[in-house]
Amino acid sequence: MRYFFSLLTSLFLIVPISSGDLASSLDQNLNGVMTKVTDWRHYFHEFPELSNREFKTQKSIAEALVEMGLEPNTTYGKTGVTAFIRGQNPGPLIALRADIDGLPVTEKLNLPFSSKERTVYQGNDVGIMHACGHDAHIATLLGVASFLSQNTDKLNGDILLIFQPAEEGAPEGEEGGAELMLKEGIFDAEKPDAIFGMHVSNAKHGQLWTRPGPMMASAEAFRITIEGKQTHGSRPWNGVDPIV
């Protein structure tokens, strides 16, 4: 998956790691890593969960990290997961973040790993789908974690993995997402020198898009109320036309 390589490429650029040694190790273990990433992506795509309800997703991520010899922390953001990869050489602390929630969208593709999950959302029976690529984000970060956890001797500094829930927005009346994780003190003990995330895109294989500052802003919904003032047609100046 090209996003796995994009995130690893970013690491080679931003962290003073022994990139040559890591690249050589990746070449030697490429097929095994890619098989894992593909399997994870299919699994999480088949079993998506909505914001603040990512219970099975959280459990599966934590179990995968344990198998890598890491110690997952599930105390932040209700259904979030964090874990450290400690390099054997001094260097910065870099955080890598992936979002994990799905959307109330019914999948229409008939694939072996298509989502068949359903729920009641705002009074309607709807499907649940990873329609925004978060399944690929989870799989990519797990792939990077799997690779780096086996190469800590070549890693200068530490990596903080952040699997963030509720990126699409917490349910009405609930807290969630990155804001809640920060409120709960995710960086109180150790503050990263930098944080990097990524999103699936239409970039060609081998390309990495980035820019300083905000990137890929989301579209938000809002509701407004316009109040008019009734008047007679012969005296429009006494009224307020809400349409105009």
Residue positions per predicted region:
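Acidic/His- and Gly-rich active-site-bordering loop/insert found
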Residues: 22-130, 139-143, 147-160
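General alpha-helical segment detector with a strong preference for membrane-spanning helices
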Residues: 6, 103-105, 137-139, 203, ...
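Histidine/acidic-residue-rich, glycine-tolerant segments that coordinate divalent metal ions
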Residues: 118-129, 135-136, 153-244
